[in-house]
Design a protein with these regions (language model features):
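Aromatic- and Lys/Arg-enriched surface recognition patch
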Residues: 68-72, 76-143
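Active-site catalytic microenvironments for nucleophilic, acid-base chemistry
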Residues: 60, 80, 299-303
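TIR-domain catalytic/interaction hotspot
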Residues: 37-50
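Aromatic- and glycine-enriched beta-alpha-beta binding-site module
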Residues: 58-59, 73, 269-270
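Short, solvent-exposed secondary-structure capping/transition elements
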Residues: 66-70, 83-87, 271-272, 305-309
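Short coil-to-beta transition motif at edge beta-strands of beta-rich domains
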Residues: 47-63
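Charged, terminal alpha-helix-loop-beta segments
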Residues: 1-34, 49-52, 99-104, 127-369
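Catalytic micro-motifs at enzyme active sites that drive phosphoryl/nucleotidyl and oxygen chemistry
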Residues: 61-64, 82-88, 135, 249-251, ...
């Protein structure tokens, strides 16, 4: 089985033992006490739904008094993500079953990875996470990062063992994580993580079916990509049969900002032929999102695309007002149209804008521009 996707899981001296003893990765969640607790749940769900059976997982152990930060590997994901509070680890309700893919006894130091002159340009998601310093329990890693980490771990472990994937070892879970698009009512008032299950919550507003938070669009796209929903993604030009990598919330260069979503397509799983950069937006398209979509797509072209114009910038939003010269429109819409016209003088890949409608089946992405 070809593996193109992996994630780094941040662990401490306690949680790393949970993984070793139980072959389960645990993600901590805060108690649902603040006004935006649903946003936090959707944020974690988005990351969890990016994980797929067969993908790799690395453990990034945080620094403590007597040791530096270290990276362990390599585990393989063997279940869909799920939510469970019926144990002594109720603070860690988001979970996924794993097994060893490579048995490496010795870890590698974080310093060896992030300061290696031969691979530093390839480690963009790890460097981005380190610089951002945000408390994220798990972060995606690129195909090049997976290869580099395994090579470095092999160098540290002469007598390592590789365990081939066998789908007979896949574990079925009773209630895998997913958003139910039919649930649009009020959410319950809860105090504890054990008071609810994420699958039973409402992530869309009742009358409009718009997402309650922008982050929920990341969750939905990961959910539909994990299903390889051909009808859904074909609407924006993505061929799910060619997709080799996808992820939400990716670091942009070494700045402390993030790209919402990236999808990579390839011919015969090897030669990248298209990259899709997707910015999500609640409400109506604005100038900042337009600028970011073009800025991020340029950066991807210069890095993953080897300087070519391979990246298609896309915005998915609630509303887009088409500019018509023969009708009076709001000044902001005129300004947005002017900005788009200026960008298109220089950009070979024109920005595409889609609105979404999750009240219908199949889910609708309507091209507006």
């Amino acid at each position: 089985m070809e593996v193109c996707k992996g994630r780094m899981f941040v662990v401490d001296s306690d949680t790393i033992n949970y993984v070793r003893e139980e072959n389960i990765l645990y993600i901590k969640a805060p108690e649902p006490t603040n006004a935006e607790w649903l946003k936090t749940i959707a944020d974690i769900m988005a990351d969890m739904l990016q994980k797929e059976i067969g993908g790799y997982a690395f453990l990034w152990e945080t620094k403590r008094n007597d040791q530096k930060s270290r990276i362990y590997g390599v585990y393989r994901i063997i279940s869909k993500p799920f939510y469970e509070c019926e144990s002594d680890k109720q603070d860690y309700p988001f979970r996924i079953h794993v097994e060893k893919a490579y048995d490496f006894k010795n870890p590698i130091d974080e310093y060896e990875v992030l300061n290696n002159p031969y691979i530093k340009n390839s480690m963009w998601t790890m460097v981005g996470k380190k610089i951002a310093g945000k408390p994220r329990g798990t972060t995606p890693i690129s195909m090049e990062e997976i290869k580099a980490l395994i090579i470095l771990l092999k160098d540290k472990n002469e007598n390592f063992k590789f365990i081939p994937f066998d789908d007979k070892r896949i574990k079925n879970v009773e209630k895998p994580l997913q958003i139910d698009y039919k649930k649009t009512g009020e959410n319950p008032k809860v105090k504890n993580l054990s008071d609810f299950h994420p699958n039973d919550l409402s992530y869309l507003w009742e009358n409009s079916y718009y997402v309650r938070y922008e982050k929920i669009l990341e969750t939905i796209f990961n959910q539909e990509m994990s299903k390889r929903n051909e009808i859904f993604f074909k609407q924006i030009g993505v061929d799910v049969n060619k997709v080799i990598w996808f992820s939400n919330y990716l670091p942009y260069s070494i700045e402390r900002s993030e790209m919402d979503y990236v999808i990579i397509q390839a011919e015969e799983k090897n030669i990248i032929d298209k990259i899709f950069l997707i910015e999500f937006q609640r409400g109506k398209v604005n100038i900042n999102h337009i600028r970011r979509a073009y800025m991020y797509s340029r950066w991807i072209n210069e890095t993953l695309g080897y300087g070519t114009n391979i990246t298609k910038p896309i915005i998915v939003c609630e509303k887009y007002i088409k500019f018509k010269k023969d009708k009076s429109v709001h000044k902001s819409d005129v300004l947005i149209d002017n900005v788009l016209v200026e960008y298109e003088k220089e950009e070979k890949q024109k920005l595409e804008i889609y609105t979404y409608d999750f009240s219908v089946t199949p889910l609708l992405l309507k091209k507006c521009r």
